[in-house]
Every structure is written in C-alpha cells, then in structure tokens.
Amino acid sequence: MATEQMFCFQCEQVAKCEACTGGAGVCGKPADVAEAQDALTGAMIALARTAREAGVKNDRICDLIVDGLFTCMTNVNFDGQAVTALKDAVRVETVAVAAAAGIEPVSDYDVDQIWGDDEDIRSLKSLVLFGLRGTAAYADHARVLGYRDATVDEFFADALAQLAEPGSVDALLPLALKVGEVNLGCMRLLDEANTGTYGTPEPTTVAMEVEPGPFIVISGHDLHDLKLLLEQTEGTGVSIYTHGEMLPAHAYPELKKYPQLKGNFGTAWQNQKKEFDGVPAAFLFTTNCLMPPKESYADNVFTTEVVAFPGCTHIGPDKDFGPVIQKALELGGYDEPHTIPGINGGTTMTTGFAQGTVLSVADTVVDAVKSGAIKHFFLVAGCDGARPGRNYYTDFVKATPDDTVVLTLACGKYRFNDLDLGEIGGLPRLMDMGQCNDAYSAIQVAVALAEAFDCGVNDLPLSMVLSWYEQKAVCILLTLLYLGIRNIKLGPTLPAFVSPGVLDVLVENYGIAPITTPEADLAELLGE
C-alpha cells in the first residue's frame, strides 16, 4: 500500500504488530530512510531484470545487490544519504549493463506495488525479499574472507527479478523455500570461511568483567573486522571486549590468541542505550544491531561496512581503525574493574559448542540418549528484542528438566546464557553454538543424530523453540522449512508480514505454532 510516509513491517517489533507507517519506525529509522531503502530495493530489482535480459552475471552486480540488501536490514543503516548514494551506484551499473548489451535499461521498480498487492502475494514476496536480506548478510561475511559461491551469488539477482512479476501463491511459495535452500548453502560457505580462517571453535568461558584501562567494545557479526582491530591494537594498551553477537569470537583459536581480547561487555543489543551510557570507551559497530545512539555517547560510536548513522564516524574500506583506538585512549576506560552481569546475575558465559565440538563427542551424546541420561534436546535460539514477553525464553530454559540438553545460538541466548544448568555425564546442559549463522552447526548436529539413530530429524527427541526479530531469522526459518523441519515454536509474536492464508499453509504443512507459556509448551513438547 502506498503511504504518504513510510511503510515497513519487516521486523518483529513493528507498531501494533501490523506495520510502522508514521514518521519513524519503532527501530528508530526515519521515514525518509525507509523510503530511500524502498527506492534502493526498486533500483536493485531493475538491475536484476536488466542483467537477466542482457544475459549478464558477474561479481560487480552481485556485490552491489548484496550490499544493497544488507543495507536494508533492520538496525543497519540510518543514513539516508548513504542509502541514496548506493541506489545511485546501482542505477549507474544498470545503465552500463544495458548499454554494453545494446538494450534499454529497465526502469526502477516501485516496491509499493508489493506493499499494495493481494495480501497472500504480498506476504510471500515479503518472505522472499526479507529472506534475501538475511542471506545477503551471510554472503557479505563470507565474501570479505575470500569465500564466494556462484550459485548463491546468482540467486540474489534471479530472485529479485521475480519479485517484479505478478506472481502466484503456487509460484512464490517454492521461491521462498528456494531462498531457504540457498541460505543453507550460504551458511555452509560462511562456516567454511570462519573455520578455515580462524580455526574450529572450542568451548571457552568468557568473563563479563571489564579490566581497568582503555578499551573498545566491538559489536555485530563480522569476525574479519574484529581480527583487523585486534591486529591494530597490538602494543597500544587498548583492550577489546565483544558485544552482542560478537561473543562467539572468543571460541575461535586465531582470535582468542590475542591477549587484548579480554571478555564480553553487556547483554543483548536492545539494552545498549542503557549499558553504553556514560561508559568511557569507544564502540565499533560492524553489522546490525545498531540503535540510534544517545547524545551522551554518540561521539564514541564508530561504524564500518554498510552500517551507518548520521554524525557517527564511519571507517571506510581501508579499515584504518586508528580513530577508534585514539578515542579509546582519550577516554581512558575505568579506573577499577567493572562488571555488567547477565540478566540472571551471572558473571561468566560459555561459548564454542559449534558442530566441531559437539560432533567430536557424538558417541558420548548417543550413549547418553540410549541410556536414558538425556531424554530430550531443545534448540532455544534466535534473536533477542525489546518487546515484552521475551522473558518466556528465560523461564522456558529454567524450567527444562535436568535430563534435557539446551542448545542455543544467536543473541536470544542472552536471556539465559549466564545461567548454570549443570551437566549430564560430563556434558554441559547448556551449549552455545555461536552466532545466528551457526544455525548451520545446529542443523549438522541434528542430521548427525538422526543418522546415528537411523531416523529422520523430525523423529528425534528434539524440539525447536525459536525467537525472531530481523531478517536473518527469516532466512533461517525458510532454511528449516526447506529441510522439512516440523513443529517449530515461534515467538514472541508471529511476523506481521505473514498473512492468515500463508500462515494456514505453514501450519498445515509444517506445524508451525506460536509460543504460549513455558509450562504449557514444555509439557506439550515432552509429551506430558
């Protein structure tokens, strides 16, 4: 639907669980930035259609589309001028591709045609578009490490081009599942990139105490930026603390070897305005999730890659983090040790239980299941957010029986990752598998267990209780649906962009259901 201001319903905390349509979104994105992102999306669709007509596929086209899709994710880019500049670059490429092929460039697509379409068509096209945005983030992280996959790269343009076509439920549902299939390949690629570059993650206990002295807090998902920052801070006396989804970096051998990588600062992304206020440190955002900074610390915030906020210093492609380091030295850090405990009062967290670690003890896990020591596995994973009701995930994990194992990943784990759930046969009951893209690890572990027990994944004593917030959660959900995973519990609310008709299909074919209460859901999942 066309609006005089913005229309955006891609994240979990949209206004009234419907859409953000006023002068700014709940995320803080102004209407002019939302409109610029729609214009950028329309320009990318035009580039995709022009390239298809010209029969052209190359890295330049893919890179522009990946950057554009990533830019439009929630809590990434709040700078309308930067978004418009990228749109202009996309248009220049569209004209160049057309000229080289001797054809007319396709006009920029008006995405209001999607927002105003039949609700089921709009729903499925939104699933595709938002899923592509999530997958693009993973493709970007792999790309900066030198890993690419032609199948993944070419799919972005192909899928975008299809969004401009009239479409039908019968055609768009398979396209949405194709996004899930391609995202699986992209997560596999990123897993290879991360482990090939930084080693196999290993169980690591991470402190939540900040030592005296100057320090930098690095947030986001980009391990490459962290590695560069660690290299540039050697010998400076500046310590590095991870934040949010950067926590799993502590488990990678090639990153944890740096002595200045000290610990983790704070809790999940949505608490940053409170936790960053008055902190004598520099903050570097490498990806989402950036919130509009408070004036009290805005001068200490730096962005890089596609992340941007007006007035905050942006570190360009040269990756010279000198200004960030200098700011940390100027601020000086704390005079005494300072601790920000987890939401349950814990002061340490453990990470590093990716597939390499879990599969290395697969025999022990299988034996524990066969002996009855482990009765059930729960994957409690996904995004955190500010909407009331997310304490459900804390209460759910606290209530899991002692003979069950909780696997987790992504930032939703901050609801409970400072808890000590004890052990089963030497194995911790709570295992953090990593970032959201490490859903690939969870999938591989599930597949390995299914093979060990000669059954399907849906037949395992395994339940998935997921939380979502932004578009990477969308592409992961599509991957799980592509794999045929059933009976997923999803919360804290269902996506506003999923129409009743599409929801009926997902419920009928995949058994997706909203979370209710921890007690009721636990009883159902355990068959009690």
What are these regions (language model features)?
Residues 44-197:
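Electropositive, gly/pro-rich neighborhoods at or near active sites that engage anionic ligands
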